[in-house]
């Protein structure tokens, strides 16, 4: 999901009335080794890269943070990923967009509570 906000901005935002009110949300529920992507691959996919991001390999969450209208991070009791994610330069630069949802349990989280919190975040985007 981290590449979608930039792809949307680059290819669809402002193209016509249909896309005018669409907002993008980057949801992060897990950090893994697949979040690193080469700058060249991002450029080939025409994903815009903010000037502050340096290097040949970039973190996709950093890239997406600049273009998403909101960033939702779901922390688990055993893995508080929001703390790690907020140390990433692109996410830190966009911390005003970040909302953290704390899951109640690793194995059986309260999905209704998570959905309700996400719904509140989405409602703020449409105001």
Predicted regions and their residues:
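Catalytic cores of nucleotide-sugar-dependent glycosyltransferases that transfer UDP/GDP/TDP-activated
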Residues: 1-127
């Amino acid at each position: 999901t981290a590449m979608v906000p930039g792809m949307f901005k680059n290819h669809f935002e402002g193209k016509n009335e249909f896309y005018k009110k669409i907002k993008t949300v980057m949801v992060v529920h897990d950090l893994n080794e697949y979040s690193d992507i080469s700058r060249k691959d991002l450029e080939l996919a025409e994903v815009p890269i903010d000037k502050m991001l340096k290097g040949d390999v970039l973190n996709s969450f950093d890239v997406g943070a600049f273009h998403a209208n909101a960033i939702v991070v779901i922390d688990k009791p055993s893995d508080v990923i929001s703390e790690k994610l907020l140390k990433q330069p692109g996410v830190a630069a966009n911390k005003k967009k970040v909302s953290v949802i704390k899951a109640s349990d690793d194995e059986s989280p309260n999905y209704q509570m998570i959905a309700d919190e996400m719904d509140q975040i989405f409602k703020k985007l449409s105001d």
